[in-house]
């Protein structure tokens, strides 16, 4: 009797987290566009104050975790107890605002053992940020966007316990349309910032390695129908003027 065994080899592809997947730079984020501030009137432009923008800069609740695998679960839930968290100034780097991991300066050498697209897990610090806000009363029937001008090096965003999205690129803004996540009255915003991501391999420049929400954070409102992006083109004459 001859027994034939048929062996089927199944190749299982590893599922990478967004922060270790070179094919994913953002999830549910708005497409990159020209930078601008919306205004309701010429008078607002002349004053330099827009009623369509609401700053979220200031004191945020903050929790430092030495490695992403040590991150608490459900920290984004609205009923999660953050009474033991510290406060931190936004914008700002956490290395410069407390006894957290130190700033790192290196030129050619990576600040961690390179194994692209992977980054260390046990030594990849994260910062948990949280703050509450109320939407201005005159923002009715408009699209509401959340703008981060700069976060290093990657982040996840939750609003009122619901996951909004992900973004990595420490030098470019990130925007999310949060209209469907908002509720009447007070809203709770939670952000998880990762020190390292696969983007850190491309951002390995001759400069200080600092982390956190280091540029402005604000909300802005736009009408349902609006200009989202624009470009300006000009031609040069024969003298390149």
Predicted regions and their residues:
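Bacterial Sec-dependent N-terminal signal peptides
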Residues: 1-14
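Short, contiguous pre-domain boundary segments
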Residues: 32-44
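Surface-exposed, low-complexity/disordered Ser/Thr/Gly/Pro/Asn-rich loops and linkers
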Residues: 88, 92, 97-121
